[in-house]
Amino acid sequence: MLTARTRHLNRLRRCAFEDTGRLEGVNPQESRPSQLDIASWEYSEDFVAPSEAFRNAHAAALEDGLPAVTSGTAAMLTFLARLVSAQAAVEIGTDAGVTALSLLSGMAQRGVLTSVDPEAFHQETAREVLKEAQIATNRFRTIASNPLDVLPKLRGGAYDLVLINGDRLEYVEYLSQALRLLRSGGLLIMNDALASYHLADPDNQDDDTLIIREALESVQQTEGLTTSLVPVGVGLLLAVKD
């Protein structure tokens, strides 16, 4: 018997690109970077020298087989948190502490990050990362539970920044909750917005890519957002709520 998620994914495969075979404005012939493009990407990734704390956290995450954002993504997260002077932020998916370190490094001095992840081990690792970086423990609030059970209980309109970086198959649901949580002028960040650079390939119909396409289309159709799609790391979707 097909689950609701499987039926939904099958509908996306049948319908998502029937007319154009791609997202509007994306040319599949131009989606694969040349060698010069790759060199430019690598240069931009390394432009901001990562801190020792980031290097240690990133290396530890990879050694443990845990996901970790690139140095360019980390630098962008710090920059964006500083840009909006974030006092209160939520991250969906703890990412072994690398994203938490990046966000808290840019947030206001007493800013608090709430991190929601179903895996307690990820959050324990994150606490160790932040301890080594000498970030106060009261600035990092962890909730080890299914984000879709937790997010509806958080106060709407109370957060300056929300990072989506959890289960890719839940991105559409995360997106809805993230927009509810943001204050007016708050910033939404969605990691892996280019689906590990598979997004522009119309032949790629894997589950993660289909859901990320759907999430991006939802953002495009949502009024009251100012958006940008940035090819840093594996892609960041940025959206400011009116």
Regions found by a protein language model. Name each.
Residues 2-161, 168-189, 193-242:
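A short alpha-helical cap/connector motif
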